[in-house]
Amino acid sequence: MPTSVFPKFHSSLSTQAKRLVAMRFLIYTGFQTSYFIGVIGTLTYADGASVVATSLAVLFMNVFVILGSFAGGAELDAWGPRRHFLLSIIGALATGTAIIAFGSATGVVLLGAVFLGFTMGFAQPIATSYPAYLTDDPVELKDINSAIAMFSNVSIIVGPMLGGFVAAAASSRAVFVLMMLSTVLAFVVGWGFRPQTSHVAGDADADSAEEGERAGRSSNPSTSARATFAASIKTVFTNSVLALLFCIIFLSNFGYGAFDPLESFFYRDVLRVGVGWMGWLSSASGVGAVLGAVVALRLPPHLVNLKTLLVALMSVGLGSLLYVGTPYVGVALVGQIALGIAWGVVNPLHNTIVQTTAPLEQLGRVNSVMGFGNMFAGVAPLAIAPWLAATFGVQRTLVGAGMVVTAVPAALLLFGRRHLDRAAKQ
């Protein structure tokens, strides 16, 4: 990373913003040690399960990530970040304990995927919504979101790498111990987190952090109480920016849903590498994503828009084609880095656009609605992924999925210019 970037980025953050970045980094590192290796890796390598089993695991994960995100968004809007964070910690520790205790049979791993998915979804607002509790300044929000994205992507390096070594030395299920250790560290760091709510409610009692959180959610508590999910859905689809963003993410991620259930078989049968490589190649994606977050940090404010997001999403597709296009692990490594760079730009852009558009008192649930579109796009291809893999082969199916991921944002850029210009004006 260029030496001129990090000091500027580091000094621009408040103390609470730095604490938030650390909270997200630690809890997300725990999730990254466990999902791909602990669930998909156990099914593929330890159990010798079929594509159907891994597809079911991803289906369960995605469905319960959606349900968890709705529950987490509602909890955040009702009680604020501190209680939401505590419940996220409890959920992660309980999930890790249960998976370790009950063994690695296929049915148990699938049930573990349910609990892990719900916990990961519940914790999503830490990255997507908490920054808006610290500031409402768009430039500062972009910096915080870029910082969160950067260190979340460091998690994608550190988590799978540690998980890969643990899986190679012990077993794929042992990675859940790492998840629990990382979660405990996140709790320690997050103990001093205090939302800064003066930009929302100037009369908040400075001597009461709990009152500050409640004031931060809305200057009118009765209004906050009446803000239901139906209102949040209406907020998304009556706002041209949010509605278009929902459609962009849904359509762009539709092809990407085929990757999760098939990637482990791509490693085993096409690249012909062991389970440890699942972690190490994921870490390569994290290296790229850190670089992408640096790019996002340096974007001028006028480029924080939907057109830039579409270009980044198209780059995701191109990177995925390089990743799965050959049987050579070296090429896959380069593809993962390219893919990571693109995702490193996408995530902070997406979160900043949502946070500067949605009302704070509904932000948790608005992000849940946006997350639903993202995750449902990943669920839909699971119904046909096993058939496609059996008919065309794993690698050809993944290449086809990469082509879809590339083509959708390209088409939206070419043919949706009028809608993009209208959203930009708003």
Predicted regions and their residues:
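Cytoplasmic membrane-interface "Motif A"-like loop-to-helix N-cap segments
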Residues: 78-89, 300-313
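Transmembrane alpha-helix termini and helix-breaking/packing motifs in multi-pass membrane transporters
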Residues: 38-46, 158-179, 269-270, 380-398
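C-terminal ends and interior cores of transmembrane alpha-helices
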Residues: 90-104, 314-327
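Helix-loop junctions on the cytosolic side of multi-pass membrane transporters
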Residues: 182-207, 414-425
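Helix-loop boundary and gating motifs at the non-cytosolic
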Residues: 2-63, 239-283
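Substrate-agnostic recognition of the 12-TM MFS/MFS-like secondary transporter fold
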Residues: 19-36, 61-74, 80-89, 108, ...
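Juxtamembrane intracellular "pre-TM" segments in multi-pass secondary transporters
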Residues: 1-17, 196-246
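Helix-loop junctions at membrane interfaces in 12-TM secondary transporters
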Residues: 101-113, 324-335
